[in-house]
């Protein structure tokens, strides 16, 4: 059921049997995210997970990550790297790096982009 849920949430329902080489760049990105979310790991690292996605897919993927990391039945922590300020609203905490060093750690509502 988790597989079906995650595939639906990232917009990949119906693509289960398609060969990967036939998928578009955005579809491959969504499939990669789905695989990470389904993996039963306690921690996942996502580097620019919405980079190749359209606006609708970006929102769905980020909401799915938020939902799965908020599920108290199976703890999942996700660290995602982004340059998109609007994605911060999905985070529980924001760490800002400057020149390779941690310069701040705070709640998303208190973060100010410089």
Where are the model-predicted features located?
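Conserved ABC ATPase "signature" region
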Residues: 1-15
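Conserved ABC ATPase signature
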Residues: 19-23
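Hydrophobic anchor residue at the start of the ABC signature
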Residues: 33
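Catalytic Walker B motif of ABC-type/P-loop ATPase nucleotide-binding domains
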Residues: 44-48
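Helix N-cap at the start of a conserved alpha-helix in ABC-type nucleotide-binding domains
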Residues: 55-57
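Conserved beta-strand-loop-alpha-helix hinge in the C-terminal portion
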Residues: 101-114
């Amino acid at each position: 059921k988790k597989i079906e849920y995650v595939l639906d949430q990232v917009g990949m329902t119906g693509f289960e049997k398609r060969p990967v080489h036939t998928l578009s760049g955005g579809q491959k990105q969504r499939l990669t995210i789905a695989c990470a979310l389904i993996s039963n790991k306690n921690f996942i690292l996502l580097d620019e997970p919405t980079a190749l996605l359209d606006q609708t897919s970006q929102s769905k993927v980020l909401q799915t990550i938020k939902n799965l990391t908020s599920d108290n039945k199976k703890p999942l922590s996700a660290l995602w790297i982004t340059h998109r300020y609007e994605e911060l609203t999905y985070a529980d905490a924001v760490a800002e790096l400057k020149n390779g060093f941690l310069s701040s750690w705070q709640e998303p509502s208190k973060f100010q982009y410089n």
